[in-house]
Amino acid sequence: MRCRTLARELRRRGAEIGFVCRQQPGDLIEMLRQEFQVLSLPPLAAAASSSSLEGRALYGAWLGFSQQQDAEDCLSALAKAGISSAQWLVVDHYGLDASWERAMREGLGSEPPPQLLVIDDLADRSHICDLLLDQNFFGAATQQRYGGLVPAQCRQLLGPQYALLGPEYALLHPLVPPRTELRRVLVFFGGVDHDNFTGRTLEALLNPKFAHLAVDVVLGLQSPHFQSVASLVAQRPNTTLHGPQPSLAVLIARADLAIGAGGATTWERACLGLPSLVVAIAANQLPFAQCLDQAGHLQLLGVAGEISVTQLRQAFAEALQVASVGSGHCLTDGWGTSRLASALLGLDHPIRLRLVAPGDEALLLRWANDPAVRASSFSTQPIQSEDHHSWFEAGLSNPERLQLVPLDQSNCPIGQIRFDRIDGLASIDI
């Protein structure tokens, strides 16, 4: 889904987009074909059981073939479609690494060769990419995880400020007010929710002490638990069951608390400042969910197999009594897709300027603490949020300071320009 979000923005900027997908149960090929050209690879001969596998072995089983065979299938599909060159190859698969990437580049054989964007969050294998995106949060380690895994010249876009969200999130980010009272809960554990955490959550919310809470439940029609969840929804007043949604933005914006999984929806909730209770339902969700919990950006309840209805009920009771569940609102402003599109295609439109606004505080702090910025600053130590807040607040009312934010064609902030005048001397910071 994140690749579709990126593809939409690239197409809006004039790029020609194609997807290469292997046929398998539950694939999204027909959905993608409604918008894009899709080249489908031959299906797996038989789905091997992967229940006992983990780590690299598990991700290799997801691929279903050797990386060399998969690359040959991709190249064959491209050749049959008459595609012999590309400006960028975008790969988003845990089972692929530098060997597949090398085979694809060499197999296309175009001059110049295609550049390569890798989307990853595992940091457990080598890549030969020109651009790497990892939109997840790992605390102080966020900027260091890919050392030695990518070429020295690879540009790394790391952290939630690059989260691939739909354009509605950037528009709503400055408009949604902070939550001050718990009145409405959003329940979403993914479209399928194999472990039926949606049902468990509703069982917890059937307790009379939560009767005043309105509840929005989102679940895909293909979920094996849809009917049982619908039955629970019918037992609870002021509770609505929603089927598949083109975007969760409206439901997130009107909720006061969310409970859900720790996947990509984490950044949608954070962008709109929604305090969240999180259950890690997949192994790759746990590391960054733990980091977010430790930093106070959400409350991690635990991993899927460890959470009971009683624990869920207790978590809701605590959320009612103490408004201490983090939201992560400062982590992302919703412009990640635009930032990545600009990194891929460049800035080919005039840049506009606007005055800095109160809502820019978190963004300016992220920029100031970027490793490249700190390395070229008078002090290489990260700026603390409390110190930055005092400096930022003073600057907003300082008549001797002019601070501007350049915007790209999508109105995405791409930098800052500051003019200061002190005792007849002027300084410029870019």
State what each model feature region is:
Residues 253-264:
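Acidic donor-binding loop of glycosyltransferase active sites
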Residues 381-429:
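Acetyl-CoA-dependent GNAT
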